[in-house]
Each structure stands twice: as C-alpha cells, then as structure tokens.
Amino acid sequence: MRSSRVPILITLLASTLLFASCGQQHKAEQQVKAFIDENMEVADEISGRDFADLGTTRHISDSLIDVMRHRGAPLFKKQISYGAKPSGDLYYLRMSYIHKGDTLQNTFYLDSELQEVVAFK
C-alpha cells in the first residue's frame, strides 16, 4: 500500500519544482525586459528576443560587478542607475536578440529575489 504512494509523491514534488522554476524564469524575463526598455538606447529597434534558462552563480564579486557596471555594453545608456550591490548568490539570464540584422547577446545578473538587474555584460 505504501509503495503505491511513492510514485504519486514523486510526481507531486517534481510538478511543484517545475512550476516554481517556471515562475522564476518568467519573473526574471520580465525584470530584464523592463531593464532593457528603460536603459537600452535602441530598445524599439531590436527583435527576436530569446532567453536562455535562468541560472545561479556565486562567482561574481563586488569588484566584478563594479567593472560590469562601468563598462556597460553597446546600445545601452552610459549612466545607468543600479540598486545596492547584493550579497550572496546571483541569478543570471542570457538574452539573444537581433539588431540591424546582427544577432547579439547580453548576460544580465539579478539579485536573489529577482527584483532588479544588478549588472550586465
């Protein structure tokens, strides 16, 4: 009797994890889209936005965040206002897009709550 419940429990747990990760992916994509609309100089000239899977990293130090913030990227405004530097793990999301026939890519780093983009390259 107990062994018949195991597959049901596994299915429920897997479904819960799947829905939670889909929600995080969607939230991250929305934050990046809002960041682009606000900070990209040519946001209305890009098409074909394609997002990779959301990932996490511990390998981004405060000094690396400073470097990315200072360098920025082509097509983006120079004086972007960021929030406070986060502590702990960061999420990252890669986005590919087309601008004037060229396929370009940027990586966006988000805080652990997926509330804001803290740096990008």
Predicted segments — roles?
Residues 22-121:
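Cystatin/cathelin-like cysteine-protease inhibitor module
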Residues 1-22:
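Sec-dependent bacterial lipoprotein signal peptides
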